[in-house]
Amino acid sequence: NKVFVAKRIDNPKNFWQMPQGGVDEGEDFLTAAYRELEEETSIKKVEIIKEIDGTITYELPDHLLGIIWKGKYKGQKQKWFIMRFLGNDEEINIKTNKPEFLEWKWIDLDKLTEVVVDFKLHVYKELKEKIKKIIN
């Protein structure tokens, strides 16, 4: 039960996250998930295990408002998909055209909430519990 996490370039502290991103106009959630995964990690070979029901929302802390996303947004409403990676680790490349990550690793699902930034902790707690119910 390993999950992919990566350390963001814009946060030099030891905080990790799973790939995520926005939905372009006219794009559905699943298409956006595939696109963001490939843009951030070069990963193409995946299968969908399950779409997580509902959305999970977080807001940026006050000290980051106006800094992150050029002040355009104050948080995110996220739609998550559980995917199984079907490729080899050698296919993973975070040195993309617009790199977002410094490094990546596989971690145990149970460790997920130990490595994320505080303001996203509730997102990853909820996500971890939903994933556990689906894969067990």
Predicted regions and their residues:
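Short helix/strand-bridging catalytic loops that position acidic/His residues to coordinate divalent metals
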Residues: 19-23
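Unchanged
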Residues: 24-118, 122
